[in-house]
């Protein structure tokens, strides 16, 4: 086992093998950069026609997300497919956790047949909601999905 000391802002071993340590650091940095770019490839947030989505252009899927600048309101019809900024058609397959949570001005929503799951607290506190069209394709309802809607 080697002893390391800190000198002149460089970590160097007592036997003077500074280059092996630098090589190790470079290897770790390269591995982290490769892993992070592979994970992020094709996955991005976009606002399309007033809806915020998490798009996976590789899988050609989209999840409707909560808005970051206010709430959804009125009568809403969610499209079955959306086109990403780079031209990829993505099927809307899910509503994320809290997608419409707290949207008291939301009165009705039509969910497309491409959607298979509604996340936790998806419509929580949507007190103005009077009509929801849920297709048979939806097989998963998150916990508290319609909590405090009446």
Regions found by a protein language model. Name each.
Residues 38-45:
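Boundary at the C-terminal end of the N-terminal hydrophobic targeting segment
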Residues 57-58, 71-94, 103-117, 127-140, ...:
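Structural signature of tandem-repeat unit edges
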Residues 97-99, 119-122, 142-147:
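Consensus positions within tandem repeat domains that build extended binding/scaffold surfaces
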Residues 16, 23-35:
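Bacterial N-terminal signal peptides
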Residues 1-19:
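N-terminal secretory signal peptides that target proteins for export/translocation
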Residues 63-65:
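Non-globular, low-complexity intrinsically disordered regions
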